[in-house]
Amino acid sequence: MLSKPMELLRPSKGMINVHPIQRGGILTEEARKVLLEWGDGYSMCDICLEGRVDLLDKPPVKRFKEEVAEFLGMDEVRFTAGARHAKFVAMSGFKGALVVDSLAHYTTYIAAELNGLRVYEVPNTGYPEFRIEAESYTDVFEKVKEETGDYPAVALLTHADYKYGNLADAKKVAEICRDYGIPLILNTAYTSGIMEVSGRETGCDFIVASGHKSWAATAPIGILATTFEFAERVFRVSEVRGNWSGRAFTKKEVALFGCSPVYGLPLVTLMASFPVVKERVKRWKEEVEKARWFVEEMEKIEGVMLLGERPKNHTLMNFETPSFNLIAKKHRRKGYFLYHELKERGIFGVQPGMTRNVKLNVYGLSWEEVERVAEAFKEIAEKYGLEVED
C-alpha cells in the first residue's frame, strides 16, 4: 500500500515570522532565484577539478571564500555543516581544557566532548540580566591553572547568546585571552551577517558563523574563519594511506570530512545573499532601535518584563510573562492559547505551548511590522483582562 502523501507546506506562509532563530536566515530575493537552478544533489560539483568544494572556480567558491575572509577581518575561511561543525573544527586543534561562557549553545559542549576537551564555565550574573562579565574569564583561567597545573588550551565566547540575546564584550575578552596567550573562538552565530564583526578589530583567533541563522542562506551551513597562525593546525590535510592499495587523499582536510558537506543550496544561497548581507550589516543601529522600542511597548503589558541586559543591544529577546501564564492555566487551550491568538493576527514564530516566557526576534522587520507585533500582544492582553499602559 502506498503511503499517504506528506503535507509539506509551511504553516507560516504570508505571516510575520518572529521566530528567534530564523530572522537572520530568511532568504534574500537573490537567493530565492537560485533555488531551482542549484537544487539537484551535488549540483556544485559539475566542474570539480580539485576534489574540494572550497577550491571551485565555477561557481567561484574559491574567490568567495577570500571575500568572506576579508569581510570578517580574518585570513582563511572554510564552509562547514553549520556553526556546530565549525566549532568542532576549531576545537580539533587543541587538547586540554576549554573555557566557555555559561550561555553557550549546547553544540559548544558537544563539540568539546567530541574533541576530548574538558569544559570549564564562566558564570553569568544570573536573574534578571544573565550577563557575561569579561573579567570572569580571568577568574576561570586561574581556576583551571590551579586545578590542572596548566592554563586552558583554548577559550570560547558566545558573541550573542540564543537565550537572552545578550551581546558580550568580545574585544575585552579577547584582550584577556591575549594576555594569557590563550586562543579565542568567537561564536557569532547570531551576530556576523546581521551586524559588523571583524576578527582583527576584536582580536579573536577564530570566528564561527551560521549561514542559516544570520547570513540569509538555506540550512545547514556554517563558516569558520581563522588566522594564518592557526589555519594549518585546524585545516590539516589527510596523511592516511591504504596499506594494500596505497591510496592517499592529500588534499582532503580531515576535520572538514575531506570536503565540506555543503555542496549545493546551502553554499550557493550563501553566495547569492552575500552582496545584500554586506550592506545590511551597516543598518544594525536601526535594527537595535526597533528592538528597544519593542521592549518599551511589551513592558506596558501587565506582568511582562524583559530578561537579559538593558538596554537591548540585539534583536533577539526573551520576556518573562507570568501574566500570560496565569491566563493559560484557566484557558481550554492551556499554554497554546497565545500561539493561536498570535496566529489569528498573522504573527508566527512564538513557541507553541510556552507562556511563562516569550522569546522572539524582530530583526529585518519593517517598523510597521514591529508595530503590528506589539499591537497584537497588547490586543491579546486586553482581551483577557490584563492592564496595558497607554
UniProtKB/Swiss-Prot annotation:
Residues bearing the modification N6-(pyridoxal phosphate)lysine: 213
Residues binding pyridoxal 5'-phosphate: 83-84, 187, 210-212
Alphabetically ordered keywords of this record: Protein biosynthesis, Pyridoxal phosphate, Transferase
Database matches in Gene3D superfamilies: Aspartate Aminotransferase, domain 1, Type I PLP-dependent aspartate aminotransferase-like (Major domain)
Subunit field text: Homodimer. Interacts with SepRS.
Species whose genome carries this gene: Archaeoglobus fulgidus (strain ATCC 49558 / DSM 4304 / JCM 9628 / NBRC 100126 / VC-16)
Family named by the database record: Belongs to the SepCysS family.
Identification of the protein by name: O-phospho-L-seryl-tRNA:Cys-tRNA synthase 2
Catalytic activity: O-phospho-L-seryl-tRNA(Cys) + hydrogen sulfide + H(+) = L-cysteinyl-tRNA(Cys) + phosphate
Cofactor(s) annotated in UniProt: pyridoxal 5'-phosphate
NCBIfam families named in the record: PRK09331.1 (NF006810), SepCysS (TIGR02539)
Known function: Converts O-phospho-L-seryl-tRNA(Cys) (Sep-tRNA(Cys)) to L-cysteinyl-tRNA(Cys) (Cys-tRNA(Cys)).
A Pfam match: SepSecS
Gene Ontology MF annotations: Sep-tRNA:Cys-tRNA synthase activity
GO biological process: translation
Tagged with keyword Translocase: no
E.C. code: 2.5.1.73
